Each structure stands twice: as structure tokens, then as C-alpha cells.
Amino acid sequence: MGEEQSTVSGSGGARASGGGSAGQPESPRPRGDRVRTAGPRAAASSSRPNGGGGGRDPGCVDASVQEPASNRAPAGQPARLPLSGPLDPQSLELQLEREAEGAGPREAPPGQQPPDGLLLDVLAQRHPPPAKPQVLCSVYCVESDLPEAPSAESPSPSESPPQAPLGPIPASPPPSFPSSPLSLPADPLSPDGGSIELEFYLAPEPFSVPGLLGAPPYSGLGGVGDPYAPLMVLMCRVCLEDKPIKPLPCCKKAVCEECLKIYLSSQVQLGQVEIKCPVTECFEFLEETTVVYNLTHEDSIKYKYFLELGRIDSSTKPCPQCKHFTTFKKKGHIPTPSRSESRYKIQCPTCQLIWCFKCHSPWHEGVNCKEYKKGDKLLRHWASEIEHGQRNAQKCPKCKIHIQRTEGCDHMTCSQCNTNFCYRCGERYRQLRFFGDHTSNLSIFGCKYRYLPERPHLRRLVRGSVCAGKLFIAPLILVLGLALGAIAVVIGLFVFPIYCLCKKQRKRSRTGMHW
């Protein structure tokens, strides 16, 4: 019924039957034809209607099409082989090779894949066609600075790519820009597959090995505070150990990170804002970024507090208790009462302490700042109160602000005016050579709490006597020294010529020369 059936003759030729064109031969079949032999599993398949044989492979026998009765063998007898001559299992390969040589090379029609090989069912054992291996492809995009050298082998005409038109070749974009889209077949196994556009973004390399070996040091923040500064194995100037060290930005000397952190922490504990370089030969100050980078969180807070305290003007002061900065406004935080000093009354928003902005002390109700500075009992009681084995606060002798000591010695430095004073007595640090300093017991500049603190009259008498003795002894020693010097000069004027003559006479007597 309009179907086309084809059978294979013993000589390998194809003939048309049942509705096909009688005078039109069928195209030769490729080498991949499936050949079936009789066996228990060989049976005729039911035919399915098809419009003129469309959609079938023209080079293969459709197993679903029913063969004519003339080509079917009787039941129980094997079917005829599509080979010329009898089938010998021992010489099967040789017969197949001869048949292939006789048929000659055949090409698959366009748009059709070539067959994989001959598939035979010998003795009712079907060998399935070999499965196509799965290919996993990894695409790598590598950009080279140098163009590729042309290949020595010239491609064949069928494989040669289309020639590009002559003209100037546009410059390739830098690696930081996305490369041109790359077209790849959708199915690598199919000759005419679709295309997939892939974009490869090549980020520029942050550094290169030759650049690291020959590049100069990074000119950033510098020092240990710079995370991008180069590391070099140097000997620390403090601990004298070889470590990976970033040189300091000020003097380019080597100080390890551990020693620098210990030094900076000690300076911050002393209240220093301008910290000098730990190298003794360098007289410059370290940068703020380097100091903050090498401090702990607590020391960093203290250092920033000292910085703010040194930068503020007279209209901003810290709270005496919690160090919260407060800026005074002329119209006051509290409505101005009858007395003018009440407008300096400040309540700290952090610790709720009420204090006086003018004298920087706790609020003194009913007493003006002048009386309070002269020795008010409230101020003395608050300042001289002992907490944790030390005074509550001490007043700077110059700027009159109160300073609390957390730890350390009695030598204090005011963060407001940089005045050196003693925390125990509140006096300035003075020293004079030959008369002593503030730490001397018998010096007139000594602390009153170091020598006879309970007997001030005797202390003054002893120190005054020592000072007077030094004043009287110093001129005597000076006069005595001048007298001895004059005597030595006079004696030298007479003795030196005589000594020279005697030495000259001895030299002549040794050489045998006479007058």
C-alpha cells in the first residue's frame, strides 16, 4: 500500500518491490548495514505504515517493515546471508574483507553520520553497536602577550578556514576587558551543531614574580602600620633578633612588631601624644596611623582620647570623672540664676556628674570658683581623698586642671599644657646641677613628702643649711681652683725651659757631640 520494501540479494545488490519504482535502482547501502541470520530469536516484525518511506535511513534496512514472502525462509531454516558464497565461521573475517574490497569505498549521504561498522548476529547472538564515548571538555582561555607563531604545516583545502580580508588588524583589548565571544558547537560530537557564546573575563594579575624581586618598596603608609609594605628579614634594633620586619617610615630602621607594640603601649600609658621613634639616632615622631595600628583596643582608645584632649580649645573640656568631652555654650546648659558662676554648672550626660566648667572640678554650690581654688574644703576633701592607695586627683600647677593617676610614678605630665609636676605634692619638677632635683632629700627643690613630711620646720632648716653650704663652698672651691691654676702657671714658666735644656743635653751626650 504505497510502502517501499527492499531486500538484499546474495550478491549484495538491492531491488525494489511492492509499490516502488521498478526501473529506478536503489542507492547502494553503506558498510554499516545490519545483517541478520536465522536463529531462535529471528522473527518477522509487524510493519508500520509510513508515508512513502520518509523518515527512514535510506542506507539501512528497516527492521519494522515486513519482508516479502519470497525473501523469507521457511520456518526452521536459516535465512540467506547477504554474502556471495557459503558462510564459513572460520573464514568470516576474510570473507567480509573481500566483500568490502569488491564493493569499494562508499560515502555516506550528506547530513548523515557514517556507520560505526558491520553488525552481525551469528548463531542467534546479537552484538549491540558500541556506545559512543562521552566526551567531557574543559575550555581554558589563555591570553598570551606574544602572538602565536604560524604553523609550519599548511592546512588542507577542505580544512582550511576562510581567509580574512586584508587590512589593519585591530589591537587586542587589554586583559582587564572582557574578551570577544567564543562560539562553540552545542554538541562536540555532531559536525553541524549550534553555537554557544561564552565570555571570559580575565582579571589583571595583581603582581608578578619578577616585579616582586626587582620592584622598589611600596610607598604607602609605610612602616609596621602599612599592611602592604614589603617584609624583609632584618635584625631588630631593640631585641637584636633576625625577624621579618617592615622598616619604620621615619628613619628606615628595623624594629620588630613585638618591640614596637611594647614601646608604644608604655608611651600611651604615660599619656604621651607625640611619640618619638624608638631608635635613639632618630629624633622624628611616629605617624598617627603607625601608632594606632600597633596598639591594642584599650590603648587605642586612650591614645585617641589624648589626641582629642590636646586638640581641643578652651571651650571644650573633659568630664573630671568619665572624661566625656563637653563644649561650653555661652547661654549655658541650665537657665542662668542670679549668680554668674552658676552658668558654668554642667551635668555630664554619661556619668551624670555635676561639675563646674570654669574650674574643672565638682560643682561647688554657694561658693565661687576663686574661693574654691584657694582651698575650699570640698575641693580639698575630694582631691585628697585616698582611693586604691592614691590620691583622687591632683591639680596642675600651671593650668589648674585636675589630673587623676591610674598607675606609674609620681612624675606627671599635664596633657593640657605639658607641665611636669609631682603628683604627691603638686609642685613643678625643677632641677639644678650641683643643687639637686625634686627627687633629692636634701635639695631645696626636693618633694616635701620625701624628707621629714611631719616636721616641715626641721626639713626647711636642713635643706637651707645644705643649700647655704653649697653656696659658700662653691666660691671657695672656685677661688682655690684659680689660685692653684695660677701657681701651676708660674711654676711652669720657670720649670719648662729648664726641663727642655736638660733633655737637649742628654740627647747630645748620647750621640757624642760636644759644645
Curated annotation (Swiss-Prot):
Residues binding Zn(2+) 1: 236, 239, 256, 259
Gene null: resulting phenotype: Macrophage-specific knockout mice have increased iron export and altered ferroportin/SLC40A1 degradation.
TRIAD supradomain, as annotated region: 232-451
Enzyme Commission number: 2.3.2.31
Pfam family, one: IBR_1
Broad class of where this protein is predominantly found: membrane
Annotated Pro residues bias: 158-178
Zinc finger (IBR-type): 301-369
Transmembrane segments: 476-496
Pathway participation: Protein modification; protein ubiquitination
Cellular component, GO annotation: cytoplasm; membrane
InterPro entries: BRcat_RBR_RNF217, E3_UB_ligase_RBR, IBR_dom, Rcat_RBR_RNF217, RNF217_RBR_vRING-HC, TRIAD_supradom, Znf_RING/FYVE/PHD
GO biological process, one term: protein ubiquitination
Cell compartments where the protein resides: Membrane; Cytoplasm
Catalytic reaction(s) noted: [E2 ubiquitin-conjugating enzyme]-S-ubiquitinyl-L-cysteine + [acceptor protein]-L-lysine = [E2 ubiquitin-conjugating enzyme]-L-cysteine + [acceptor protein]-N(6)-ubiquitinyl-L-lysine
Residues engaged in binding Zn(2+) 3: 396, 399, 414, 417
Record's bilayer topology term: Single-pass membrane protein
Binding site for Zn(2+) 4: 422, 425, 438, 447
Zinc fingers (RING-type), renumbered ranges: 236-282, 396-425
Record remark on domains: Members of the RBR family are atypical E3 ligases. They interact with the E2 conjugating enzyme UBE2L3 and function like HECT-type E3 enzymes: they bind E2s via the first RING domain, but require an obligate trans-thiolation step during the ubiquitin transfer, requiring a conserved cysteine residue in the second RING domain.
Function summary: E3 ubiquitin-protein ligase which accepts ubiquitin from E2 ubiquitin-conjugating enzymes in the form of a thioester and then directly transfers the ubiquitin to targeted substrates. Mediates the degradation of the iron exporter ferroportin/SLC40A1 and thus regulates iron homeostasis.
Protein name: E3 ubiquitin-protein ligase RNF217
Species the sequence originates in: Mus musculus
